[in-house]
């Protein structure tokens, strides 16, 4: 095994569906990310598996599924580039009880401590595999490793036993030390194309065509988010409420805007979903104003409302509204006052 830096940027899904049924087709079950899959399979077939890999990408992009399939394939008794799903090793891996695939856990929600890394990995890695060619450690949420934990882990990554493979999964790889990054094969899972997401929702989850198109647009290339949207009755309520707001905000008196903000205070955990819907709606309005094309709209069934807003608002006004949504999202991420942030955004929508 060789340690080297190899960065793959793939313009194609974490959907963390790592139960047995989701593995039944191996890598074929993964939506997109073909370049990354090919790289992993080539490493296996050429016997050039590295000691450390870093799977980067936002939550829901597919990191956990990709890493789990890679680990399962490495341990498969058929020694192919896909897990066979039938051997004892694959069955144990599917059931998450494989003795040589270790998932590192942590007690505190926001940190992985040096003691947890020492106990579950550093001390354990010196014990040879129980029944497999590799001993594989999966560290999910690796961005939560403390500085001390990272420094301790670095020594193992630099001088690992020949059989050790460490798979780090991180929403934000930049939170890791440059010295760790430089010693890992970095595989960055980027958003999947909307058509791939739509096809997945229709074929695998039996979502109707129009709804699949809307869900795919709202998911923004994230299969995990697309699944959540398609399965969640609560999201339907969010969608209806958000569309009601954008359709009528221009005629709302100030007291009704303030009442809307009060209701949204209870939805703070889902506020990013509202911002996504607001942005897509006004993008549709701007697109329709410029082209009169209906087929390119996300919310085709809302054509009357989109046409009415397009006739009322100027190009400059629509651009101001879209910018105000982006600013509101950034302000809330920076912990600016919720009510004030939402009021400024809604007033921009109303006045433009």
PLM feature segments, named:
Residues 16-18, 24-72, 89-92, 162-164, ...:
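Charged, glycine-rich active-site and insertion segments that engage polyanionic ligands
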Residues 151-168:
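Conserved catalytic/switch belt of AAA+ P-loop NTPases
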Residues 2-148:
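Clamp-loader machinery-focused feature within the broader ASCE/P-loop NTPase space
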Residues 141, 168-173:
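A short beta-strand-to-loop transition that corresponds to the Sensor-1 phosphate-sensing loop
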